Each structure stands twice: as C-alpha cells, then as structure tokens.
Amino acid sequence: MNKKQTIILSIGIPLFLLLGIVGMKFHNEIYAWTLGDVKSLYVQAESLYQQKEYEEARKLYAKLAGIDSASRCQYVLGDMYFQGQGGERDYEKARKLFIQAAEGGNADAQNNLGYIYTMGIGTDTDFHEAKKWLRMAAAQSHPQAMVGLGSLYRNGWGVLKDHKEAFKLYRRAAAHGNTDAMNNLGYMHTFGYGTYTSIRDALYYIQKSAVLNNPVALYNMATFHIEGHGFPKNMEKGAEYLKAAAQLGLPAAQFNLGRMYQLGKGVEQNDQEAERLFRQASAQGHQLATDFLMKMEAKDSTSVNDSIFEMKMIVR
C-alpha cells in the first residue's frame, strides 16, 4: 500500500464512521419531527399509563419507542408487553424492547433483563447474561438489581457461591429502602449465611420489611409465630400475618391460611374460606394448593386430618 492510499484510508475510515453517526442522528431527528411535539406526546403517554388506560398508552409508547434515545419509552412499552397491559402479553417483544432500553443505559430495563434471564421467562435461563445486566443496573445504584445480583451469589448461579457478597449486596439495597433486601437480610441472619446467626437481628430486618407491607416478610413473620422462633408459639398471631400476606397475593400465604381454615387452627374452621384460598394459590401455580383443592372437590376427608403446612421461610 502506497503512502497516498494509507492517507486516504486513515481519513476515510473515521469519516465513514462519522457519516454513519451523523446519518443515524439525522434519521432519529427526522423520525422525532414526524411525531410532532414529542414532549407533549410523552406527557400524554405517561398520563394515560398512570390512569391505567393501557391500550391508548401502549399506542403512544410504541410511537415514541422508535426514537433511539427514548430508553424510558422503550422500557415502559417493554414492561406493558411483559405484563400484558393494553394488549396481549408478549415476552419476546418485551425482551427486545428491554435490550434497546438497557443499551441506552436504562437501569430498570437492565434489571428486568437480569430477572428474565435468571428465571428463563420467554427465553432460556442464562445466569451469565443475567449477571451482566444486573451488574450494570447495580452500578447505577438500582436497589432491586442489587437484590437480584445478591441472589445469584447466594445460590451460586453463574458465579461462585458467596454468601458474604450476597449479604453485602442486600445491605446496600436495604440502605436504599428496598424491602426485599431487608427481608433477605433477616433470612441470612436466621441461618448465619454470610454473617453471624441472630434471631434478634433477623426479626429486626424482617419486621422492618413487614411494616412496609412486603408480602414475603409478612409471611416470614407468620412462620416465626407459628413455629415459635423468637416468640412463643402463637397460631392466632401467625394467622393475622398470613391474612395480610395472602391479601397481597402471596401463594404460600394463601395455601397455609387455607390449611388453617380447613383445620380450625388459629382461626375459626371454615371450609368455604379454605377452598377460596386454595383456588387463589392454585391459580398462581401452587401445587400443594391444587392437590388439596382436588381432595376437597372429591370430598376426600383424609386431607382434613393431614397436618401438612409449608411454613418455610421465603427469600427473594
């Protein structure tokens, strides 16, 4: 290659890249211009979303999501596809929109991708991909991403199991007011994972989370009262916490409260209430609730004398 060709190449490649960037920016501005007053459109979309007018909000977000820099709109539209708000649920479209938003730096989208890849929702489980996105969101101080990343370390998913690192991440998230993190700190103190064992400290964190209406923490408070950890055994108090968690839609709480109504423990015996709670839990995929519901429908009396509970602590 002669000197002239070298000079042309050295100028041409950066110039080509610059033209590409300018071209993309120009295309983005042209698209935004065709939408009219973008700010007004965004305010309208947000307002419709807050009013739960999901179908109309979804249409506006779909227009706005076409702007490359509109990561917030891409995230919200993705979440609407994920939740099935304003139309059909579509996990694949949700994931693609989350990727767009996450690449634009949206921490909520990065966190959601971490969750999707951890749980394998609409795609294969991929802990390494989950770790990548959760780390990016956690670096932006996203509390729920810290919880998700902590859970990868707690379980050894895609990383070496490290309870101390998990505890550190939960503590950081709890400092931001995250109630899942508070509950998880209580769980770690209960069993001495990554920290010292202390029922007193466990109760401190779980109660703090329960006061803020975290359903898992409310459920865990029920386990302490029913099993007699940190308190004298008290089925009535346990039932109160289970009622609160069940009302917030936690399947494990619905099932165990149903068993209490079926057996008349901590509450007045009531088969109709037991059946109602079993149906709620079963609809969310709780297998034991489904089994007991089938026994009730078959009028199988053996289930009434069966003392099965599922009072195990839950962590997120």
Residue ranges and their predicted role:
Residues 268, 279-316:
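Terminal, low-structured helical/coil segments at or just beyond the last alpha-helical repeat
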Residues 10-22:
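Hydrophobic membrane-insertion alpha-helices, especially the h-region
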Residues 1-5:
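Positively charged n-region of N-terminal signal peptides that target proteins for export
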Residues 36, 48, 67-70, 83-85, ...:
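Short helix-capping/linker turns of helical repeat alpha-solenoids
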Residues 52-59, 88-100, 124-136, 160-172, ...:
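Structural signature of tandem alpha-helical TPR/SEL1-like repeats
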Residues 41-48, 74-83, 87, 97, ...:
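Hydrophobic face of amphipathic alpha-helices that form TPR/SEL1-like repeat modules
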Residues 22-60, 72, 76, 309, ...:
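N-terminal leader/linker segments that initiate helical-solenoid repeat arrays
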